[in-house]
Amino acid sequence: MATELIENKLKLLPEKPGCYLMKDINGTVIYVGKSKNLKNRVRSYFKSKQVGRRAELVREIRDYDIITVSTDKEAFLLEITLIKKYQPYYNVQLKQGTGYPYIEITREHDPQTRLTSVVHKDGGYYFGPYPNVYAAQATLKFIRKVYPLRRCHGYQGRPCLYYHMGQCLGACFKKVPQKEYDEQIKKIKSFLNGDITSVKQDLTTKMEKASENLEFERAAEIRDQLKYIEETVEKQKIISNDNTQRDIFNYYVDKSWISIQIFFLRQAKLLRRETRMFPLTDAADPEDAFTSFIVQFYGQKNRILPKEILIPSGFDDDTLAEVLNVAVRTPQRGQKKSLLDMAKDNAKLKLDDKFRLLELGNRKTKGAQKEIFDALGLPYGHVIESFDHSHIQGADPVSALVVFKDGEPDKTSYRKYKLKGEVEHQNGGDEVRNTREVVRRRYGRLLREHKKMPDLILMDGGQIQVDACEDVLRNELNLNIPVAGMVKDDKHRTNHLLFGDPINGIPLKLIPLDPKSEGFYLMTRIQDEVHRFAITFHRRRHAKNALSSRLDSIKGIGPKSRNKLLRNFGSLKKIKEASIEDLRAAGLTLPQAQTVKLML
């Protein structure tokens, strides 16, 4: 079942490709997935019945995060990086060391091209990773045919088979000039970086010619070759071919708030990102706030500067670079510009989500509270107060007060009341006395201190509690505060509000709320909260009084000694576990400590 937080976030999902990170109650990433349409995919986890391992996953999800990208291919590549970074429990497809392949140009005297699953800091050139392993193999095969380097094991005194096939420059029997290697490597790098127009044109011409000559198998082979080249050499934004350590900053401003997105690229991978959002002061300029944030960001403890920082246009790169002592650049085109744009898109997405969540929150808070006031025919009020009583067969009676402001609990205003007299039985008369006492104490004090009264009082009960509350307010305190009762059905479920206006001759009547409405949800929340608060307070008081009673029965332990024990140990169990020395340290004499140990 989705939490309230998840339900709200599901309404904000974009219909874009990207990755989603499912988190458990501790905020740990337990699953990473990708989709062409984040809205449909993420919603499917919570809006349809799940079975097996997926059902187990959904039961653990307490929150999620998303990263949007431009294409499904980028989502696939980002998913690889995120899985390797977080090693989520429910991801079994990608383990450390068994990832997708890269195409490598080795850094050797006689270099070669090959597939590898591990990127080493050896000066070689790495391209990838490639999700389609077969396509990567086919592309490597094409490169070796069109841009040959070395295919053999090195010098052996005679030409190898690949040399005769035109797939080796001849390191097997001669010294190949470095210039020749450099020219080939330049072509391979250009090809793998996306410059494939001429190659595609050449292959397309050959495919058409083969088809005209009725060489259909040959034409199909070239067609597949084109497909594999497009799949592996397509430009990638998430996995860069540049291994420079790089941080990318961009921002988005709306409604006097700024959202700043930071991408951290390490070893050609987007390892993580951070989002910071904060309101702008009236005098703050967004550009100044952005640059100030960057400087403060790297001023934090344990924050390591990258080799390069990318920021959008409109800023003094040189000054920022001088302050940070690192290269600061503003790309105008190409892959870096695309990454910068992606950072801005994600900054906007995060800020839009924040505003939409606030709007949804207002519907669940202020909007819900308005529904309650509307149902009662009252003008909107900001403050609702609610009471509940608790006791066990009349022992240790207490009352509790909770306060909700604009639909949100204001816990600093909560109050606990120890009721003065004990009651003998739990009946209507007891409820009347408890209600009258706590209402008199609460609102009598507000009157004496000249404090603002609530806009509505909700009593956890029916006509008995409502009548008792209104009698004290109007006849003793001369206050006219609306009072309603939260009535439960025979299954102890909140059912209706009980409300009337005795002053104007309107009798009490049951007022229903739509069980699916936000107002009904808020009413049950208030009722559950005041009940919880009262029960918790009563349990603590009852336990303390029970302990006091047990201590009072011990000969030689008077009120002062009892209070010392209560203050130092708090519970009967801890007093029992205490040693003679511990009891003496709490202020008891040796005979008293020995008596306590003997009696307990």
Curated annotation (Swiss-Prot):
This is UvrABC system protein C. It comes from Lactobacillus acidophilus (strain ATCC 700396 / NCK56 / N2 / NCFM). Its main location: cytoplasm. Belongs to the UvrC family. Pfam families: GIY-YIG (PF01541), HHH_5 (PF14520), UVR (PF02151), UvrC_RNaseH (PF22920), UvrC_RNaseH_dom (PF08459). It comes from the Bacteria. It is found in: Cytoplasm. HAMAP family: UvrC. The UvrABC repair system catalyzes the recognition and processing of DNA lesions. UvrC both incises the 5' and 3' sides of the lesion. The N-terminal half is responsible for the 3' incision and the C-terminal half is responsible for the 5' incision. Signal peptide: none annotated. GO terms for molecular function: DNA binding; excinuclease ABC activity. One of its GO terms (cellular component) is cytoplasm. Residues 197-232 form the UVR domain. Residues 15-92 form the GIY-YIG domain. Disulfide bonds: none annotated. The keyword Transferase does not apply. Interacts with UvrB in an incision complex. Keywords: Cytoplasm, DNA damage, DNA excision, DNA repair, Excision nuclease, SOS response. One of its GO terms (biological process) is SOS response. NCBIfam families: uvrC.
